[in-house]
């Protein structure tokens, strides 16, 4: 897809030719950009949040847009005000779009909408929690049809924006909806079930009977659910298990973007005898996985388990130890809700996505068949309710 910034380059080139031909010396200020579309998760050019430092959403909406520069007068690519164009914007929580975990999984769902539905897409990376509302408004004021907000912490800002912009559909990833709002779908997951499966795998693979979990902050309910499920699953299959679970001590602004702390905490767990470590905390958890992968015995006597997505695909540095991942199927969940919005059937309230374990990949032959069979039985029990994780969100 062409980026909106190409219009600026083309305009400047045309102006330079005209000025040279006419012998003029004055220059013309180009119109300000609005959020641009992209094919790639990472942009080198100015981002919408950088633009926000210079103008409010309302000012950006009033300024000239790339569509207004279309010399043929038609709806140019990027014309989100056109009913013929589906525009989808994504706002991350504090952290990068390429976190190789939570944010990236949601963005992949948006990119799938670009490929399969012809949507024009863009993201904004949040750098400060105080920017939530303004980042959402950047998309809303520029005519975006669907806005995806990623993470529990954006829940309040998403509800406020949905009430302010009732004609825009919102998808709140990991945002439980206590009261349904007509234009919000909360994409939620049973993280305790995914954690239970990861814990059961760890409890059956361990030789030392000590396993660990390196986690994001307990201020985020899904992280707590992963941890509680992990511990319950391990205890379900191994009554002698010893579990070392550690939450990041920082707030939402740092708890998921601290791979150094993740690595240090994983090393401490290894030193205490843990031989299977679950990394569940965005890039912080990735640091734990990579630390285990670099340790002596990785893949033979030491294993690690990823989170949110199949991290075999996103964290290749963890391959030496990465036996599986506790997955929330965020990518298909986001895509399905975007498609529902396009069809005019976005479900209000909560939409429960699927969870499960990722494939074993290179460890397929190392995982005993008995372990695989037990995991199948546990998954079936969790689904039919005969097995419970014991996790109580209100408890």
Residue ranges and their predicted role:
Residues 9-15:
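Hydrophobic helical h-region of N-terminal Sec-dependent signal peptides
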Residues 27-395:
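A residue-level marker of the well-folded mature domains of exported/periplasmic proteins
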Residues 1-9:
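Bacterial N-terminal signal peptides that target proteins for export
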Residues 18-21:
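C-terminal motif of bacterial Sec signal peptides marking the signal peptidase cleavage site
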Residues 23-25:
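Intrinsic disorder/low-complexity signal
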